Amino acid sequence: MRRAAGMEDYSAEEEESWYDHQDLEQDLHLAAELGKTLLERNKELEESLQQMYSTNEEQVHEIEYLTKQLDTLRLVNEQHAKVYEQLDLTARDLELTNQRLVMESKAAQQKIHGLTETIERLQSQVEELQAQVEQLRGLEQLRIRREKRERRRTIHTFPCLKELCTSSRCEDAFRLHSSSLELGPRPLEQENERLQTLVGVLRSQVSQERQRKERAEREYTVVLQEYTELERQLCEMEGCRLRVQELEAELLELQQMKQAKTYLLAREEHLAEALLAPLTQAPEADDPQPGSGDDSNAQDGVSSPAASPSHAVRKSCSDTALNAIVAKDPASRHAGNLTLHANSVRRRGMSILREVDEQYHALLEKYEELLSKCRQHGAGVRHAGVQTSRPISRDSSWRDLLGGEESPGEGKAGEKSLSQHVEAVDKRLEQSQPEYKALFKEIFARIQKTKADINATKVKTHSSK
């Protein structure tokens, strides 16, 4: 029986040896091309990962530079705070000096008012004294005239008295009497002169007080100018402090973005390895097993139709995963790009942060190009898988080995059922959400939440100020 079975197998092998050899050569060529393309793609992915690592290192250096700048800004902020304290103390001293000068100015004004009142009162007293002196002079002249008139009368009435009056002694006595009468009003003139000198002294004091008042007003204007300058410097210090707070918030946001990006790169690397593992293992599954004796060709011929559906399923799984990578959460990725663009427009003043933002956008573009290349490569691999599976499924040799002769309608029905099975597996894989997609959604949700919290804190600080 064994010999008969061996003879039948040998006859079948002689009849269809060139078919199996041609199919195996075609499969080997396709597997070699597939392995070559996969190796080239692996090298390209490694080069892109090296570029990403170098970009990541550059961004780490930039973040270190930004931290150093932040430290310097903090030192400058501390120095500004010290200067602000000194300015505050100087402003307080100037306010006290200003108040003291205002009090002195008020006291000087009151003193000037009192001195003007005293001068007016003294002037009125001088005028009254001058009027009294004029009255006394008038009365004295009237009295002298009356005495002369009476003397003349007595002289005319008594001729003996006329001789006495005309004598030298009488004239000397009359002169002495007149001089005594003239010396009488001299104290009033001295008082008048004293009052006039006092008025001159008071006027000089008033002029000095006016000069002091003008000097105090000039000092007051200088103090006001210094106070306005200090207020302006204080406003500039507040602006610097707010700018430092904004830079700290931006640095914190950049650090969060760096952490998220490194996490995404690590996840992408593991995901690329996981996706490329079944593709690199595919040629090993298609190779014939050496050392299987005379039954190796027959076993390969029988197992090839069974292996082709699983191979197609494996390739469709990888294609579905690549499509899921490219189409992962487009809404959240678009929202993240819009948020980054808005942040870059809002912070157009800082060149360093704008360069970091541009580099991050360039990195995102490289990442999308890499995903598109992976998708194209996956499409090429799927096309190659279809080319390798269709000749095997269309070949009638394995149908003859399995069950004799079959009609062309039954072959088409088997091929249709196989394609329906592959499509069902693809749909089931597309419906099941992969793990990395949920992880990316969670990462972008966390980033948007932190941005919302930072914006809320900024709004609270601005409202409190």
From Swiss-Prot:
Coiled coil regions in record: 31-64, 91-142, 188-266, 350-377
InterPro entries named in the record: CDR2 (IPR026079)
Region of interest (Disordered), residue spans: 282-315, 382-421
Single GO molecular function: identical protein binding
Keywords, in A-Z order: Coiled coil, Phosphoprotein
Record has Phosphoprotein as a keyword: yes
Residues carrying Phosphoserine: 308, 318, 344, 407
Source superkingdom: Eukaryota
Signal peptide: none
Family statement: Belongs to the CDR2 family.
Protein name: Cerebellar degeneration-related protein 2-like
Organism expressing this protein natively: Mus musculus
Gene: Cdr2l
